[in-house]
């Protein structure tokens, strides 16, 4: 399995490459990350899209509409290291008004926990949006999924589990 993942915003490419290597080693999934700037941003090339930091606040109406189409057609949006519940809620309502945000625990999000990690002990703060009971938006607050130094690589396990579950159709 080989897919490209878009990194948009202030994403750490070195840590993204660690995530790629982690997935390849643990799941035999080969992923390539691609950084793209706003000038030539095209969401339709990517099944998985990372928006890092507050980059979601900088998206144009056109980008939001394209992102909406991609998510409704099955893409996965990961919002990494967002800061404000208020601005994220406004963005999610604009992006997917007909689908409510949820605050499920990580164990609920990852019913198929490939790495058998007890995420409840780690206390990630997240929001999600589901379409037909499939995770389509996952947002991590005040932490970066790419920071493998935190939590003894549990951030990598979290990201790997989300991507793995998405790729196998869960």
Model-derived segments and spans:
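Alpha-helical scaffolding within the catalytic cores
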Residues: 34-39, 60-66, 121-126
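Short alpha-beta junction capping motif
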Residues: 48-89
């Amino acid at each position: 399995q080989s897919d490209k993942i878009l990194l948009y915003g202030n994403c750490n490419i070195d840590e993204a490459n660690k995530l790629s290597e982690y997935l390849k080693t643990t799941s035999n999934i080969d992923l390539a990350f691609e950084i793209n700037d706003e000038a030539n941003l095209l969401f339709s090339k990517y099944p998985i899209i990372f928006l890092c930091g507050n980059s979601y606040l900088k998206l144009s109406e056109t980008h939001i509409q394209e992102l909406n189409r991609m998510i409704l057609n099955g893409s996965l949006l990961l919002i990494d290291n967002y800061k404000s519940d208020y601005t994220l809620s406004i963005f999610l309502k604009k992006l997917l008004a007909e689908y409510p945000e949820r605050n499920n625990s990580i164990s609920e999000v990852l019913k198929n926990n490939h790495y058998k990690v007890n995420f409840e002990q780690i206390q990630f703060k997240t929001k999600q949006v589901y379409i037909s009971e499939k995770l389509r938006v996952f947002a991590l607050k005040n932490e970066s999924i790419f920071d493998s130094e935190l939590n003894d690589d549990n951030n990598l396990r979290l990201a790997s589990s989300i991507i793995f579950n998405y790729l196998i159709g869960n």
